[in-house]
């Protein structure tokens, strides 16, 4: 049984070393650092998995590894067929082979050539990222010659190999690692590169919150014996949708889900691919699209045929960007979909100033409702202000949800649940089967412990608090000042407010007093009033006398 605590420590050390190497070469806090660190990490993971599988296959076939490498009796072809879900390597692409060339003057080119070969193998075509216009982006690029001057390249490559050799650490030991293990590693890998800065599609949902949202969604109905199609239209690095896939499979990743995503960010799409590869989700990689979801959605009822209409999904989960400048595409979004109900409540107008404040999340909510199958379920992270806004698109959306009886509940989260934004957030849970049921509104805003993360303050929910939120929602528990169950009619009476606090009972506290205590209280209040009245009269007298002393000078 592997020591996962030690494995995690070793993996994090390698990530730290790679970041330190970039720093000493003047690449710290640059886009090139992110590409180098994540690419080397991915190469190391895929290499070790290939070698581990090669050894396992040779043992099962009772042959030597050398016979498999040489493709004796077509053994290598049989190996590729057996492990078709993994990225294909040849032995010449491996760390074990390349270390034999460390002393050569052009070592870095040997390494980069291996990366390009891996990307170009026909077996690896499905591991490319596709853009909305059909372009394929490979697994690897030239991560050294593209970013470093010639004089530094060999030393840089040799340092990389000093960190990733198998005698220091072998990813093959993590073959049985579960999603929780890999999600922790993945979060550490990208923590410096995936900042929720407010720009489009750069949001990262904390793993614990993603897990809680996934649990609630899955427990909203019994899981059937089928493959569910699940979707995130603003996927970022995939935390939300992959936690949902894991929950649907009851910890057996991908057993119950086919994942579909789209995201405009190149960086986030790269991160998502790494996340998928760590968890062996090759079947869904072809559904990971880089592109503008609102302007050019990429998933259709008939694959590749936009005239067939947008594809609908069993589950949708999303933490969309709240505000960003999309003025350059706003009119196209409105015009192209005018004949449909995709944006039934409207598209935010372009303001004269502060275009970066355009509420793009309102378009994502409408897109999600449009893309959800009859009987489908969704979770959407929104700014808490959306719950009570009484004008414009916000209210129209809430009214549409309530009038169609699609709301299952809302959970209002503590402030600063995301370290890089102070915006208060809530999670809408949509259920198109909740026609006659009641709606549960949860106010979890007082939970959590405040901690310092860098220069920012963050609220961290304990596992006990997360379990309380999940259990309260799933079991529809009513708790004073925490959760309340309301009907659709009552929500209409409250102007379609989704805020739990507006439905809590107002409590008036009564204190039992004796006749003597009552008389004493009244006398105390009377004395205080008499004192205040006396002071008031004295002040009035002083002001009038001061006014009499004023003279007109000219």
Predicted regions and their residues:
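Non-catalytic, mostly N-terminal accessory regions of nucleic-acid modification and defense proteins
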Residues: 1-212, 217, 221, 284, ...
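Soluble or luminal CAZymes and related metallo-dependent hydrolases
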Residues: 10, 264, 360
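Helical mechanochemical/support elements of P-loop NTPase systems and associated helical scaffolds
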Residues: 14, 29-33, 181, 185, ...
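Conserved S-adenosyl-L-methionine
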Residues: 200, 205-318, 323-327, 331-336, ...
């Amino acid at each position: 049984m592997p020591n996962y605590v030690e494995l995690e420590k070793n993996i994090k050390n390698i990530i730290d070393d790679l970041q330190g190497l970039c720093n000493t070469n003047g690449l710290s806090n640059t886009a090139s650092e992110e590409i180098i660190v994540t690419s080397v990490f991915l190469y190391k993971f895929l290499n070790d998995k290939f070698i581990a599988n090669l050894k396992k296959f040779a043992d099962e076939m009772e042959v030597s590894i050398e016979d498999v490498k040489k493709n004796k009796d077509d053994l290598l072809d049989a190996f590729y067929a057996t492990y078709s879900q993994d990225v294909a390597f040849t032995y010449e692409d491996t760390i074990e082979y390349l270390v034999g060339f460390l002393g050569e003057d052009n070592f870095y080119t040997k390494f980069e050539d291996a990366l390009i070969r891996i990307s170009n193998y026909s077996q690896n075509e499905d591991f490319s990222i596709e853009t909305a216009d059909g372009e394929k982006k490979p697994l690897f690029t030239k991560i050294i010659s593209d970013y470093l001057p010639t004089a530094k390249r060999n030393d840089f490559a040799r340092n990389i190999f000093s960190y990733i050799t198998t005698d220091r650490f072998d990813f093959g030991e993590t073959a049985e690692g579960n999603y929780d293990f890999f999600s922790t590693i993945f979060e550490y890998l990208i923590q410096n590169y995936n900042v929720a800065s407010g720009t489009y599609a750069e949001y990262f949902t904390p793993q614990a919150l993603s897990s809680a949202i996934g649990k609630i969604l899955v427990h909203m109905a019994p899981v059937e014996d089928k493959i569910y199609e699940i979707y995130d239209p603003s996927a970022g690095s995939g935390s939300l949708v992959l936690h949902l896939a894991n929950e649907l499979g009851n910890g057996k990743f991908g057993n119950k889900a086919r994942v579909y995503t789209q995201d405009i960010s190149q960086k986030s799409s790269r991160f998502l691919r790494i996340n998928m590869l760590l968890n062996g989700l090759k079947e869904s990689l072809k559904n990971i699209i880089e592109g503008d979801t609102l302007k050019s959605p990429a998933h259709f009822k008939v694959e590749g045929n936009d005239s067939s209409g947008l594809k609908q999904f069993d589950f949708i989960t999303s933490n969309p960007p709240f505000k960003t400048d999309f003025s350059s595409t706003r009119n196209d979004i409105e015009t192209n979909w005018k004949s449909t109900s995709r944006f039934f409540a409207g598209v935010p107008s372009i303001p004269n100033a502060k275009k970066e404040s355009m509420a793009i999340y309102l378009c994502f909510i409408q897109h999600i409702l449009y893309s959800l199958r009859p009987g489908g379920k969704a979770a959407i992270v929104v700014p808490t202000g959306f719950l009570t806004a009484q004008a414009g698109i916000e209210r129209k959306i809430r009214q549409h949800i309530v009038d169609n009886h699609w709301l299952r509940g809302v959970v209002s989260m503590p402030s600063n649940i995301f370290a890089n934004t102070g915006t208060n957030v809530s999670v809408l849970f949509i259920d198109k089967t909740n026609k006659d049921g009641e709606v549960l509104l949860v106010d979890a805003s007082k939970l959590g412990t405040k901690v310092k993360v860098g220069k920012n303050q963050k609220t961290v929910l304990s596992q006990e608090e997360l379990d309380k939120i999940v259990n309260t929602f799933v079991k529809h528990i009513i708790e004073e000042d925490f959760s309340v169950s309301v009907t659709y009619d009552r929500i209409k009476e409250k102007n379609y407010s989704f805020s739990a606090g507006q439905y809590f009972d107002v409590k008036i506290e009564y204190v039992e007093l004796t006749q003597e205590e009552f008389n004493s209280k009244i006398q105390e209040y009377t004395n205080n009033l008499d004192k205040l009245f006396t002071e008031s009269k004295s002040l009035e007298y002083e002001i009038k006398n001061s006014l009499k002393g004023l003279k007109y000078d000219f």
